């Protein structure tokens, strides 16, 4: 029975992949198409699990992740990388996973179960946590969304005071998810309180005995893409980031494509710092936008640390920014941004003599970035909740994904808006560590530690929103 089901799912997935390939460069179409056929991809790896094929199931689940992003990166790197899983030609699992970092935690949600694969070198372990209180994946997803809301409430993200750099919905982070979450939830699991510990117990505790490295690499799915892993709390009230560096990747394949590209593909020197572009006279969607004085302070402070002159105000023209993207190793942007589409507002190329400028004169789109040949090792997006976006079967579709697809080796983003002074303090610590040739992952971890140890910014809301997505990189900023 399972063999017949496996054959059917294999054939379906192969057909869906062929159809998706025919969509060529239509990224939005691919994302929508992938979501419509989630059942086939899930059915494939679940069928493999029923036959006890743990590693093959992991590879099949991986093949379904971030497919449209992989296509963007294929175009960027020209790698024509093979998927980890080929339904008609199963390669050696050891060969497929030999370059996966340890400890890598691949997560999947199916039915009322959270599946956790832990990759240690060529060894793959599986732990599954079933929520017997629920009968469907929809109910479990509702729980995860509710835990996300509760975590934000307990962290206190609503109390953050900062200048608004977001071009998205003005509602709170919680309200956006509330719309998708039923209100008639009375089960004890939905209660508020100790949410960060409950998330630890659900995701980390089941695999704790399998973790054997300082760095944890998470490959999340669904609502788990938005949770603050570094702030998870163990039974001894210690944060996960106190024991481990934490990094996130969209899929195993996308990371492999980055690490397999030629050594000289990404730039080794140069930095572009952009803050508070002048938007005087600009009407975006009929609205004028305020100046971002703290964004300006932010890049000016970073410029002093690195010895680099930032582009601020009128100097931060779209044309100037695009002209520099291809030649720098570091890009830091503190400006108005739209998380779902990856658009960022720059100073217009034209003057106001002929009236308000057209959007194309100041709106930096991902199409623009792709054409500009971005080759940065690290992109830091200081645009409010830049880690967020629409959660789909493809993954989180937002500004961070856009920059990875455009060629960034790694992207640092934030899950929620941070206070203005806290942002300055964090960036001071982060870039201080980067300038000492610490890797981005270690610099992030050390900056979090410094914030926790400070008297003014030790609350979780001030240090836990940051997420490093992609590869870990070291920048020799003295070359800049």
Please report, for each region that a protein language model flagged, where it lies by residue.
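Catalytic cores of enzymes
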Residues: 87-145, 161-480
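Catalytic cores of secreted or luminal carbohydrate-active enzymes
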Residues: 58-67
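Acidic, Ser/Thr-rich low-complexity linear motifs
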Residues: 2-3, 14-42, 68-85, 457-460
């Amino acid at each position: 029975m399972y063999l017949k089901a496996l054959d059917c799912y294999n054939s379906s997935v192969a057909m869906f992949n062929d159809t998706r390939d025919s969509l060529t460069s239509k990224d939005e179409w691919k994302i929508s198409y992938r979501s419509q056929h989630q059942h086939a991809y899930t059915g494939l790896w679940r069928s493999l699990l029923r036959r006890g094929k743990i590693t093959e199931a992991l590879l099949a689940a991986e093949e379904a992740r971030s497919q449209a992003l992989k296509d963007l990166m294929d175009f960027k790197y020209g790698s024509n990388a093979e998927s980890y899983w080929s339904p008609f030609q199963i390669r050696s699992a050891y060969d497929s996973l030999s370059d996966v970092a340890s400890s890598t935690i691949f997560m999947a949600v199916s039915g009322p179960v959270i599946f956790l694969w832990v990759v240690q070198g060529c060894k793959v372990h599986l732990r599954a946590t079933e929520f017997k209180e629920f009968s469907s994946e929809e109910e479990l997803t509702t729980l995860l969304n509710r835990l996300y809301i509760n975590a934000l409430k307990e962290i206190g993200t609503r109390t953050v005071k900062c200048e608004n750099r977001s071009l998205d919905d003005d509602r709170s982070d919680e309200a956006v998810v509330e719309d998708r979450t039923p209100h008639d939830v009375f089960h004890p699991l939905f209660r508020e309180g100790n949410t960060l510990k409950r998330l630890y117990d659900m995701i980390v505790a089941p695999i704790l005995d399998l973790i054997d490295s300082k760095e944890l690499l998470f490959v999340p799915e669904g609502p788990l893409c938005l949770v603050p892993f570094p702030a998870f709390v163990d039974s001894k009230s210690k944060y996960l980031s106190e024991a481990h560096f934490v990094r996130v990747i969209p899929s195993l394949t996308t990371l492999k494509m980055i690490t397999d590209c030629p050594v000289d593909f990404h730039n080794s020197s140069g930095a572009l710092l952009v803050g508070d572009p002048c938007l005087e006279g600009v009407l975006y969607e009929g609205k004028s936008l305020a100046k971002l004085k703290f964004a300006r302070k932010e890049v000016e402070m970073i410029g002093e640390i690195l010895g680099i002159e930032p582009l601020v105000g009128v100097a931060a023209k779209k044309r100037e920014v695009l002209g520099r993207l291809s030649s720098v190793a570091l890009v830091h942007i503190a400006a108005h941004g739209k998380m779902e589409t990856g658009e960022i507002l720059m100073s217009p190329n034209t003057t106001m003599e002929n009236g308000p400028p057209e959007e194309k004169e100041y709106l930096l789109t991902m199409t623009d970035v792709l054409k500009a040949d971005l080759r940065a090792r690290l992109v830091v997006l200081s645009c409010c909740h830049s880690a967020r976006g629409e959660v789909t079967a493809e993954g989180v579709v937002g500004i961070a994904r856009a920059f990875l697809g455009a060629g960034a080796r790694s992207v640092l983003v934030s899950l929620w808006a941070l206070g203005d002074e806290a942002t300055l303090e964090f960036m001071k610590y982060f870039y201080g560590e980067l300038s000492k040739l610490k890797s981005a992952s270690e610099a992030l971890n050390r900056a979090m530690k410094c914030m926790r140890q400070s008297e003014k910014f030790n609350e979780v809301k001030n240090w836990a929103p940051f997420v490093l997505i992609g590869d870990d990189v070291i920048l020799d900023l003295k070359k800049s």
